[in-house]
Amino acid sequence: MPPSRCNLGEQMKRIGIIGGIGPETTVEYYRRILDLYRQSNPDGGAPYIIINSLDMRKPLEMLTANKLEELATFLGEEVETLARAGADFALVAANTPHLVFDTIARQSRIPLISIVEATADAAKAAGLKRLGLLGTRFTMQASFYPEALAAREIEVILPNEEEQAYIHAKYMDELVPGIILPETHDRLTNIIKSLKDRAQIDGAILGGTELSLILRDETVFGVQILDTTQIHVEAAVAQLLGMSANANPNWPTR
């Protein structure tokens, strides 16, 4: 368990969260940040958390229309709302908006924690070499994960077109509204097994934060699961504590 790095005589950092994309995961981020922080600081303290919960329909419309500049402006304004509210740093509690993360980060006056960079660092630290990627179709068809992982000499393998369509449909129609079905869980795990059988993946990225609500095992058919929600949370709490997440492999887990 990592040691406490805060005391009552210090000014505690405030974390800002862009949430609502989707709502179920925003609740999960809040709970996991609280749990991990309290386990790291058993003095009974709790972190300052500022949540800016959005109506996900607006950014989803921009994504569907490929209006990425408009999306970056929209999310940048919401990050500024967090900064004005007193956040010292922030994160976007979703994978897909990281399509425009670099633009938002350049414009932001507070630091932002990238779920993509944190996940790529975690994959490298785990010694993984070939990763399956599951997420929305926007994430699976984007370059941000392959580029971040290629920089660490890790290859990304995508599901086939039919599997991608299935994952995206179940993600939007079931997971975003919080519907968890055992048959969907089984099909998702079989997709991971299929990737292992045909491409010899040794890890799989849950490249959609809602996926962590249905795939909770650390391994699936011998494939290590990279829960991007948990990785992002660990990076955020590390920032709160003034620590390096990768330097602390023994974080308490959920």
Annotated model-derived regions:
Residues N7-R254:
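Non-catalytic structural scaffold of enzyme domains
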